[in-house]
């Protein structure tokens, strides 16, 4: 190979590596984190909850950098924009639950950011450093009754998570009217607590964020690998408490 061709090939290899989707995505996420840290939280009724564990607590299944960016940049931004959206309006005096229940009547800025805030606050609680395994008690019995077995439930939930087109969430919900568990998914930051047409409503018991920012740094575009890893950190104790509370109304 001529020296000129060798240099050209080497240069293209380097440029290709630098401009790879994974590298570009990582740079974008780092930029979001820097901007979020440099921007004060907008004043308002809503606050960013702390993670219930260190950033690295879910390693190796969910990496520390993803957790840091996901919480400190993405979740913070939802809270800040929600405060901006409700300030000076009647919605400023409404609870997060009330905003979700009236989402069909809210402008996109409130609907999307209220959903983003609630969904992420829920998501952090439904994972744990020593998670995984299987549920116990009433939730375990309900899963077996409504899905046939834990393995069949897991398969159906995985299909909902991997099959959700674009950004969104997969959910295990308790439908109090039907008196049973169900699996569903929602687009963007919508959730089953919203009065939105086309959304299967119910009490969330388990939720999984399938937006790319939740997994791209570690898993790139391999969403199925991320979903498989999620089962190792599920906080079944918390999910069981949510189910028990839903039964009581």
Describe each model-derived feature in a short phrase.
Residues 16-20:
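Hydrophobic h-region of N-terminal signal peptides that target proteins for export
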Residues 48, 75, 117, 172, ...:
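Divalent metal-coordination and catalytic microenvironments
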Residues 61, 72-73, 83-93, 98-174, ...:
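All-alpha RGS (Regulator of G-protein Signaling) helical domain and cognate RGS-like helical scaffolds
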Residues 159-162, 167-220, 228-234:
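An amphipathic alpha-helical core segment
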Residues 45-77:
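Mature N-terminal segment immediately following signal peptide/propeptide cleavage
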Residues 1-14:
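N-terminal secretory signal peptides and thylakoid transit peptides that target proteins
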Residues 22-58:
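C-terminal segment of N-terminal export signals and the immediately downstream linker at the start
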Residues 222-249:
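N-terminal targeting pre-sequences for secretion and organelle import
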